């Protein structure tokens, strides 16, 4: 099993692989390869090709543009050539993100202080139904955080999620915080919720907080 480096500027090199050997070995032991790329258009094409049963969300509009000057990346877990899980992240200051979300989704927005920019927004997490319940989503999220904090300049990672996923983001994905961010009467926030989901939280973690947590979570990859 292998790391497939298809990104123009981020390389998951031997040093990175050594620092995160337990996490990477978790995937390799399941017969999965890990690909990193900056081709976000292929991610959109792939997610939009899935059935509503597999991926019941609209594509996140924050990832409609290329990653030029955004320091973004896409992660794929692959069983041979078959994609079984995805994730994406990009540099996006929280204020710009909020204003962009307001333009698309009418609603009531809260004032939440998540820390000092530069910040990295992540979304487009998906695991194939055939591979759910095996910790792949959690572990790919942890890999994403390691890449953000080891390989980019960002000091904050944040994400949007429906309110009912707060426990999962705190105790599963190991974000440090999750607070109410917006009430969207029509729901259906791309990458985060369906039409029935009206209340959304913002989850976040700083680099310093993650450096402490990631030693604590290593046991999750071997248990």
Q: What spans do the regions from the language model cover?
A:
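Conserved acyl-donor/pantetheine-binding loop and adjacent beta-alpha core of acyl/acetyltransferases
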Residues: 83-124
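Exposed regions on extracellular, virion, or secretory-pathway luminal proteins
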Residues: 34-42, 79-80, 113, 119, ...
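Active-site rim helix/loop that mediates acceptor-substrate recognition in acyltransferases
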Residues: 49-83, 88
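Hydrophobic beta-strand residues in large extracellular and virion-surface proteins
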Residues: 34, 75-77, 83, 136, ...
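Short beta-strand micro-motifs in enzyme catalytic cores
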Residues: 71-75, 118, 195-201
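Conserved acetyl-CoA-binding loop-helix of GNAT-fold acetyltransferases
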Residues: 127, 132-147
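Terminal substrate-recognition subdomain of acyl/acetyltransferases
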Residues: 1-40, 45-57, 65-67, 125, ...
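Short secondary-structure capping micro-motifs at structural edges
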Residues: 63, 106-112, 143-145
């Amino acid at each position: 099993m292998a790391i497939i480096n298809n990104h123009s500027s981020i390389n998951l090199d031997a040093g990175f692989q050594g620092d995160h050997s337990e996490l990477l070995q978790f995937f390799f032991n399941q017969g999965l390869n890990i690909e990193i790329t900056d081709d976000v258009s292929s991610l959109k094409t792939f997610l939009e090709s899935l059935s509503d049963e597999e991926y019941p969300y609209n594509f996140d509009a924050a990832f409609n543009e290329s990653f030029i000057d955004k320091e973004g990346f896409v992660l794929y877990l692959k069983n041979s050539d078959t994609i079984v899980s995805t994730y994406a992240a990009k540099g996006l200051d929280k204020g710009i993100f909020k204003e962009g979300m307001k333009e698309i989704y009418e609603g009531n927005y809260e004032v939440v202080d998540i820390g000092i920019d530069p910040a990295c927004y992540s979304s487009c997490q998906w695991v194939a139904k055939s591979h759910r319940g095996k910790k792949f989503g959690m572990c790919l999220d942890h890999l994403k955080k390691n890449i953000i904090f080891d390989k980019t300049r960002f000091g904050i990672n944040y994400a949007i999620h429906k309110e009912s996923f707060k426990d999962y983001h705190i105790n599963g994905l190991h974000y440090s915080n999750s607070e109410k961010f917006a009430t969207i009467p029509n729901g259906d926030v791309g990458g985060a919720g369906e039409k029935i989901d009206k209340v959304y939280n913002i989850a976040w973690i700083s680099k310093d907080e993650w450096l402490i947590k990631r030693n604590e979570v290593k046991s999750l990859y071997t248990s």
